[in-house]
Regions:
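Bacterial N-terminal signal peptides that target proteins for export
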Residues: 2-16
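Short strand-turn segments of transmembrane beta-barrel domains in outer membranes
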Residues: 72-74, 97-108
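N-terminal periplasmic accessory domains that precede
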Residues: 82-91
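Outer-membrane beta-barrel porins/channels
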Residues: 30-68, 111-112, 116, 120-405, ...
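Bacterial N-terminal signal peptides
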Residues: 15-24
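Sec/Tat signal peptide C-region and signal peptidase I cleavage site
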Residues: 25-29
């Protein structure tokens, strides 16, 4: 075992030990009710009278995994396949093609399962995701016997497209993207209270269909960077989620359903050092049918610490109404796979503390040769510098033009060509002056 690997294992051991100690104390306090009571008292002023007036509430339930562990403060971070629910502009700036499976479940019966995929071609990104929320439904008659059973479910499909405009070496571009989404709410049939017989299509009448869209913007640049990397360390993101309508009453009279949980979000992500990032989000819900009945704003904050290049810890908090959500998790990378486990004490959806766990596995399919192309451009650029220092300006320009064939907005190559051309012109002037004497 190498010294470096030993140090990595030592770091992970102490982090897991501290993590388990904190989690054990936190869960014990939560079970005794002390944490819940203290939180309710502290945040009681934030009670929202307009909460839960919208339909398709599962749209507010995150996929789970790393983004939820960071308090769902992911509008600006959005650096993996989880971006679908936070900022649709992110697919065009992701380095790798990714696919992921998420299982987000309460320590009860409810669960959310998600499959997502994203790919990038040049400055264009695209992807798709399928998410299903489900909870067992059992109806009992007046005698206590089971009359019907099934699952209440809400299933959402999303199709993403984004493009990074004006992307270059210095200016990283303006990423714009959208998700086109459709959701279906499935309600099982229920029985007649008098006869006990199942009423045909009774569930269909209460089922619903929604059509909606998300729009996002992502800006990336450098501010107060304390480490060396070509990647920017500061992101700003803006997004609008779930703008659309829903319908219900199928089988009878189709009518508009309650408004969708539309909201606007703004966020920042700041990587102070290479192994530490902080994120923050602000969200403002909008009731599109009656803006006066919109829910109150919410805020979230999160952090991620990369203990080693294959192990990271996350933590975050979401304050929405009087009941916040506190979460923490860990990620482990192994070859092309990345695993995440997250625990949340979720008070946002219940007056009682809800213990929620999520598991995620992500597969990295590589960057489709982008790194090789980048290394080729870097090599050509350095060769051009070598020619320039030797006074062979024409050869330097040739090399830098080859760089621009690979990356048309490679700013150092453009600047080098301009400098070399000026040097050629200056040398010509000097020779012309020398000829006069």
């Amino acid at each position: 075992m190498t010294v470096r690997m030993y140090m990595h294992i030592k770091k992970i051991f102490f982090c897991i030990l501290g993590f388990c100690t904190f989690a054990s104390a936190f869960l014990s306090a939560a079970e005794n009710g002390t944490v819940h009571e203290s939180i309710i008292k502290a945040f009681g002023l934030f009670k929202d009278p307009n909460a839960a007036l919208t339909s398709f509430r599962s749209l507010h339930i995150p996929y789970g995994g790393r983004c939820e562990a960071m308090g769902s403060a992911f509008t600006a971070m959005a650096d993996d396949v989880s971006f679908f629910e936070y900022n649709p502009a992110a697919s065009c700036v992701l380095e790798h093609t990714e696919a992921a499976l998420f299982h987000n479940f309460w320590i009860a019966d409810s669960a959310v399962d998600t499959a997502a995929f994203t790919r990038r071609n040049g400055n264009f990104g695209w992807g798709s995701a399928l998410k299903s929320f489900y909870v067992p439904f059992t109806e009992y008659n007046i005698f206590g016997g089971r009359a019907s059973k099934g699952y209440y479910s809400e299933t959402t499909a999303a199709f993403n497209g984004s493009y990074n405009f004006l992307a270059g070496y210095t200016f990283k571009g303006i990423a714009l993207g959208t998700n086109l989404k459709t959701s279906f709410r499935g309600v099982p049939d229920y029985s007649d209270n008098l006869t006990g017989h199942i009423i045909s299509d009774s569930g269909l009448v209460q089922s619903g269909l929604a059509l909606m869209a998300d729009v996002g913007v992502l800006l990336r640049f450098n501010i107060g960077k304390l480490y060396t990397s070509r990647d920017p360390n500061f992101n700003i993101g803006f997004a609008m989620h779930n703008a659309g309508c829903s319908w219900t009453g199928f089988g009878k009279k189709v009518v508009l359903d309650d408004p969708l949980p539309t909201d606007f979000s703004a966020g920042i992500a700041y990587r102070i050092i290479e192994n530490l990032v902080f994120t923050a989000d602000f969200r403002q819900p909008l009731n599109m049918y009656n803006p006066k009945k919109s829910e109150r704003w919410s805020i979230a904050a999160g952090t991620e610490v990369n203990i080693t290049d294959f192990f990271a810890l996350q933590a975050g908090i979401l304050l929405k109404g009087a009941n916040p959500k506190i979460s923490f998790g860990s990620s482990l990378a192994w070859k092309k796979l990345s695993f995440n486990a997250t625990y949340s004490l979720d008070l946002t959806s219940s007056l009682n503390p809800i213990n929620k766990l999520s598991l995620a596995v992500k597969m990295d399919f590589g960057d489709e040769g982008r790194k090789v192309l980048q290394n080729r451009a870097d090599k050509l650029y350095i060769e051009g510098i070598d020619y320039y220092t030797q006074g062979e300006f024409e050869k330097a320009i040739e090399k830098w033009k080859e760089v621009l064939v690979l990356f048309p907005r490679f700013d150092p190559a453009k600047q080098g060509i301009t400098t070399a051309q000026n040097s050629i012109a200056l040398r010509k002037k000097i020779r012309d002056v020398q000829k006069l004497y």
